[in-house]
């Protein structure tokens, strides 16, 4: 009997320690923050469509089955709204993730506010830094907060797995972008007096 009481007491103590550890970790300074970056051998102008256009986004964002633009919002820029349809194989149903553009400075910065009622909200910033010689550093910095206390408590357990997905996505972005032949007209200006033909200004 005494042994059973001791085992039960030890189990409860371990559970309390675990919960306390999760609570402390979930209240750390960078709780819910997910950052990743990758260097891509392309100019920012060539990468920009890959983080803004539905056809390109579905090629590198994991689980993204479809992007549904809100036709009542601006076609692009601040205030543009769209919904990402996420098909997580671990989930029983697809998740609709609506987002609104909050910052639009092509081809350098884009900010998006995401909010799934009852689940989470996030602010994600994409930064494209021109490194010269046709190279760009792409950074994704997201800060997520969860609506329920339980989800917030379990954040330290969820974030590492979510981070692995973000890193995989960035790696896939690099592979997809660099697989496309480089645009020879990037960086060519019409006022170049030595050019025998005008530069194509229609390329994205």
Locate each region found by the language model.
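Juxtamembrane/transmembrane-helix boundary motifs in multi-pass membrane proteins
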Residues: 1-2, 151
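A short acidic/glycine-rich loop-to-helix N-cap element
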Residues: 144-168
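Solvent-exposed, polar/charged alpha-helical surfaces in well-ordered, non-transmembrane soluble domains
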Residues: 45, 49, 55, 164-167, ...
């Amino acid at each position: 009997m005494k042994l059973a009481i001791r085992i039960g007491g030890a189990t409860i103590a371990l559970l309390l320690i675990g919960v306390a550890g999760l609570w402390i970790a979930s209240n750390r300074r960078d709780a819910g923050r997910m950052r990743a970056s990758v260097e891509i051998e392309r100019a920012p102008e060539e990468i920009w469509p890959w983080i803004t256009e539905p056809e390109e986004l579905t090629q590198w964002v994991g689980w993204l089955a479809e992007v549904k633009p809100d036709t009542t919002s601006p076609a692009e820029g601040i205030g543009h709204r769209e919904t990402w349809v996420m098909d997580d194989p671990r989930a029983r149903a697809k998740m609709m993730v609506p987002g609104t553009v909050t910052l639009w400075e092509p081809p350098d910065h884009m900010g998006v506010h995401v909010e799934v009622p009852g689940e989470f909200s996030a602010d994600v910033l994409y930064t494209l830094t021109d490194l010269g010689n046709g190279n760009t550093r792409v950074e994704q910095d997201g800060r997520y907060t969860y609506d329920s206390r339980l989800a917030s408590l379990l954040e330290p357990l969820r974030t590492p797995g979510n981070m692995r997905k973000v890193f995989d996505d960035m790696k896939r972005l690099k592979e997809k972008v660099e697989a496309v032949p480089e645009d020879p007209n990037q960086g060519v200006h019409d006022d170049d007096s030595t050019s025998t033909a005008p530069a194509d200004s229609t390329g994205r």
